[in-house]
Regions:
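Catalytic active-site module of serine/aspartate enzymes centered on a nucleophile-bearing elbow/loop
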Residues: 221-249
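Sec/Tat signal peptide C-region and signal peptidase I cleavage site
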Residues: 17-23
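Flexible "cap/lid" loop of the alpha/beta hydrolase fold
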Residues: 104-105, 109-148, 175-178, 182
Length: 249
């Protein structure tokens, strides 16, 4: 009887051990949104990746300063159990480039995003190859917002007006301090990097996107979309993120 019990315990332990060994690695994705188009724009990408088995976190950034945004992005990354893929859009690309995380981050995905080198500012990059849009406006509090009358044509021309009206009303301004702060770290030098060029982007010039991604040696995918590519082409964006994750996780 004792031998039978011992054998049963050993068998159960063996099964549990095998199950533990076969468990898949954690598949965590942290999204770092850009300015003007808020984090809710990533809803469909989030849902698509969740259905693929990924754990997805969308950080809510204040865009008050580079340090403020970095702190929130780092918190979101270090709250994950296991390795992480980080996705940045617009100014979110500059934020994630500066997040020093050691080995926890396994790859970076830039989605119509800024990709500064150490010492470069986001404003400097945008000014080097200006986009076709003309809607960025200053306010009296030291922030930049996007003119609601230009929002549809410049940021989301491939979306219906009713969707864009809400996006414009819920936009997140970006501080002049953030735009003018030099990057002190460029994580893309150390990590596998992927870039999405939104070929109809009027905020971040597609030629600037191509130039930054080429400089970084990124694997590039071009999508015919506006700057709001994550809203108009969510499946295509999710596919690039999924491929990046599966290549390193």
């Amino acid at each position: 009887m004792k031998r039978a019990i011992a054998a049963a315990i050993a068998l159960a332990a063996g099964i549990a051990g095998s199950a533990h060994a076969a468990a898949p690695a954690a598949k965590n994705i942290v999204i770092v949104p850009g300015a003007f188009i808020d984090a809710s724009s990533w809803r469909v990408v989030h849902d698509t990746l969740r259905l693929k088995g990924f754990n997805v976190t969308v950080a809510q950034l204040p865009h008050t300063s580079l340090d403020d945004d970095i702190a929130i992005a780092r918190k979101a990354i270090f709250q994950q159990f296991g390795n992480v893929i980080v996705v940045g859009n617009g100014i979110g690309g500059a934020v994630m480039s500066n997040v020093a995380t050691g080995d926890k981050v396994k790859a970076l995905v830039y989605v119509a995003a800024l990709m500064p080198e150490v010492g470069e500012t986001s404003q400097q990059l945008l000014s080097s190859m200006p986009g076709a849009g003309e809607g960025v406006k200053p306010d009296r509090a030291g922030f930049q917002f996007y003119d609601t009358a230009r929002f549809h044509a410049d940021l989301a021309a491939d979306l219906t007006p009713n969707r864009v009206n809400f996006m414009a009303a819920s936009q997140v301004p970006v501080s002049n301090v953030l735009m003018g702060t030099p990057s002190w770290f460029a994580m893309w030098h150390q990590k596998p990097t992927f870039g999405i060029v939104a070929t109809q982007d009027r905020l971040v010039n597609p030629e600037l996107q191509r130039w930054m991604y080429k400089r970084a040696g990124a694997k590039v995918t071009e999508i015919a979309a506006s700057h709001a590519v994550q809203v108009s082409q969510p499946e295509a964006v999710a596919k690039v993120i999924e491929d990046a994750a599966l290549s390193v996780l």
